[in-house]
């Protein structure tokens, strides 16, 4: 598969060769924001119902009618509108104007959902040849226009330098965006698996193996090497995911208490339906975080690079917690105080001191950092819990005695 792109000769379409046959993809929009004919792309990716594919697979913000794109181009202001515009300059017929064109995210969406065997190869072609060629020629045209404008309008040297720096900045940003878009196009496809497997005998004993793989067919075979055929491993639940090894490790940490004491690869005691619910929940919520980041890269990354951002102000922890309703209640305080006292006592024990003495001010400061309760209220509760009455009071803590002093 390859692509033939010569924008100097024609900016109306790009040609993709698959199995020796040429396929044209009509273009529209601009070289900075190219649009592709949805029908042409669907035909290449072997979608049977073009209308349904464009309606269900591509979000509304990623597709436009050709007539809308042409109208936007004609209404645009600036020197770029003539020489960086893509598509035909001929008047549109009514049917041509209704044709749906998709932008870059829309193109990725159709590729991602396609069942065509060469979908990934076509995706690489888009990244490595089609889009770079459009953008490279667009950058060349922009530089030509800038030079002509400088000659015609006698732009001052300072303005020229600013324009040059702006172009360099835009090119660097484009490289960064392309890098992120390429990364998510790979990671956005769930190509790995989390599975639960067992045998007939193990199932009766509620013993299950949870694992990860990118090759379901071969993995189960490894488990059955040397096992009797009548009690071989089989899959009883599988699901696709983004990063199976990370999820597998996360599951192991969460379910460590259920591992079989004689075989750490097996999980025991949990009813199968409950185990499925637990593992499914872990996978879905792990994938949701990746979906969120991928969505941010596709929908907010460019704007996030460009938008102005002020320096965030410092916050008052206690006020912030109170505004969020995160008040530490009495039970929390009654747990925190003994914990902090034990930590302080252990530190003193390590120093081999003859007498264990804890400074009141230091103790309250440590507790204040962990709560939004006033130091006065903390000190009142410390006295209630320890029986403190003065700096001479000896407080008993198991085998150790200590004092809290001013």
UniProtKB/Swiss-Prot annotation:
Matches recorded under InterPro entries: BRO_N_domain, Phage_T5_Orf172_DNA-bd
Top-level taxon in the UniProt lineage: Viruses
Domain Bro-N: 4-138
Keyword list, A-Z: Coiled coil
The keyword Magnesium is assigned to this record: no
Pfam families: Bro-N (PF02498), T5orf172 (PF10544)
PANTHER family, sorted: BRO FAMILY PROTEIN, DNA-BINDING PROTEIN-RELATED-RELATED
Protein's name according to its UniProt entry: Putative Bro-N domain-containing protein 019R
